[in-house]
Amino acid sequence: MKILYSLRRFYHVETLFNGTFVLAGRDQETTGFAWWAGNARLINLSGKLLGAHVAHAGLIVFWAGAMNLFEVAHFVPEKPMYEQGLILLPHLATLGWGVGPGGEVLDTFPYFVSGVLHLISSAVLGFGGIYHALLGPETLEESFPFFGYVWKDRNKMTTILGIHLILLGIGAFLLVLKALYFGGIYDTWAPGGGDVRKITNLTLSPGVIFGYLLKSPFGGEGWIVSVDDLEDIIGGHVWLGFICVFGGIWHILTKPFAWARRAFVWSGEAYLSYSLGALSVFGFIACCFVWFNNTAYPSEFYGPTGPEASQAQAFTFLVRDQRLGANVGSAQGPTGLGKYLMRSPTGEVIFGGETMRFWDLRAPWLEPLRGPNGLDLSRLKKDIQPWQERRSAEYMTHAPLGSLNSVGGVATEINAVNYVSPRSWLATSHFVLGFFFFVGHLWHAGRARAAAAGFEKGIDRDLEPVLYMTPLN
């Protein structure tokens, strides 16, 4: 009878309908894994696994470059980015490339350069991936011991972790350098409606930076998602950069303590599960950030947040009716509460009507009209600028409400356009990906723990009906 498992390891296997199928010598009989199990066949082949990872990086970078050029080719400067279904150009614009006051795109050439650089990089990665997958050594331990590893070698694994942390720290510092020295980044809070500026007064106080982590995640607090000035964002990246770099050096120079050796499972599949768990957390945080935060994700490029569009509608009609003679300070709505303005339970003046639920919105077009006790009535009567009216009217009709294949905007709004907000796309995709990565984390963690406990995973295949059926071919 066929052996349905590898003698070299205790991974469960799937049985091919056609057991004679062989793929480049890495077949089920020799590896314990069917062809569709992909990189699982390469668990003990460090050279081939390197090729798979480099090729994967090439695919990722190729998508970034190709999609970047696709968005450049379709970009219409006269329309806002968020009305054109763009998800990459807003990121480049946020970094200060190609834009000027008010988020107006002045030059698309930097976006073209970005796309070409990514395409060239993807070609290099692609060739490297193909080389290591097909031509390079199957294992690295003999020829290149620095790059070789054994999954159970705890010291080597933490060294690899340290190298990754240092690279992440360098990435954080690159943003800091761009903001401080290389042209600055886009600040939606710059006076007059946003502009590109260099960050000159970093927030480095640990009380402020780490205070975000201690905040409640709920309304009015908002955990780290509530950050609303670039000094805090860039200062946070300085802290993150140092933590990652010094943490990386620590992990390279030290060996895991006894408690860590006991607490963790030390196998390739366990490391996969840890990585998927971390990516899941990142996905959920990114979802909340892009949905609620209009500083890291400026509304000029990504469209308004949900609360921002709602408050913009209240503001737009306050402006209109005030011009028509309404006394916005005292007019009553159908419920007896203020039609345009009302007081929150804590006494602040806020917009009335249904948008009262979004009382804690902060947006650059609205904040100049606030006083010490909320919205200032005298400023609402005398100080509203044309750019604030234009921006709120635009945001009112571009709420991030549409499902991914619908006519977006507010369903009852006659001025709505066929539009889906990039915030909807990015928040939805990151939530869904975060969820699936979490499921993958649970799956691989369960398998890794079972293997470490020493029992076979999967079900007994001996009596599986498919084994007695005629092959499909």
From Swiss-Prot:
- Organism this protein belongs to: Oryza sativa subsp. indica
Q: What is this protein called?
A: Photosystem II CP43 reaction center protein
Q: What does this protein do?
A: One of the components of the core complex of photosystem II (PSII). It binds chlorophyll and helps catalyze the primary light-induced photochemical processes of PSII. PSII is a light-driven water:plastoquinone oxidoreductase, using light energy to abstract electrons from H(2)O, generating O(2) and a proton gradient subsequently used for ATP formation.
Please give the biological process terms from Gene Ontology that the record holds. photosynthetic electron transport in photosystem II
Q: Could you tell me which residues carry Phosphothreonine? A: T15
Regarding the membrane, this protein is recorded as: Multi-pass membrane protein
Q: Which domain of life is it from?
A: Eukaryota
**Which amino acid positions bind [CaMn4O5] cluster, per UniProt?**
E367
Q: Where in the cell is it found?
A: Plastid, Chloroplast thylakoid membrane
- Which positions correspond to the propeptide? 1-14
Oligomer and partners:
PSII is composed of 1 copy each of membrane proteins PsbA, PsbB, PsbC, PsbD, PsbE, PsbF, PsbH, PsbI, PsbJ, PsbK, PsbL, PsbM, PsbT, PsbX, PsbY, PsbZ, Psb30/Ycf12, at least 3 peripheral proteins of the oxygen-evolving complex and a large number of cofactors. It forms dimeric complexes.
Which residues are annotated as modified residue N-acetylthreonine in the UniProt record?
T15
Regions that span the bilayer: 69-93, 134-155, 178-200, 255-275, 291-312, 447-471
Q: Which family does it belong to?
A: Belongs to the PsbB/PsbC family. PsbC subfamily.
Query: What keywords are annotated for this sequence in UniProt?
Result: Acetylation, Chlorophyll, Chloroplast, Chromophore, Manganese, Membrane, Metal-binding, Phosphoprotein, Photosynthesis, Photosystem II, Plastid, Thylakoid, Transmembrane, Transmembrane helix
* A cellular-component GO term for this protein: photosystem II
Question: Which InterPro entries does this one have?
Answer: PS_antenna-like, PS_II_antenna-like_sf, PSII_PsbC, PSII_PsbC_sf
Q: For this protein, what does the record note about how its cofactor is bound?
A: Binds multiple chlorophylls and provides some of the ligands for the Ca-4Mn-5O cluster of the oxygen-evolving complex. It may also provide a ligand for a Cl- that is required for oxygen evolution. PSII binds additional chlorophylls, carotenoids and specific lipids.
Pfam family, any one = PSII
User: What one GO molecular function would you report for this record?
Assistant: metal ion binding
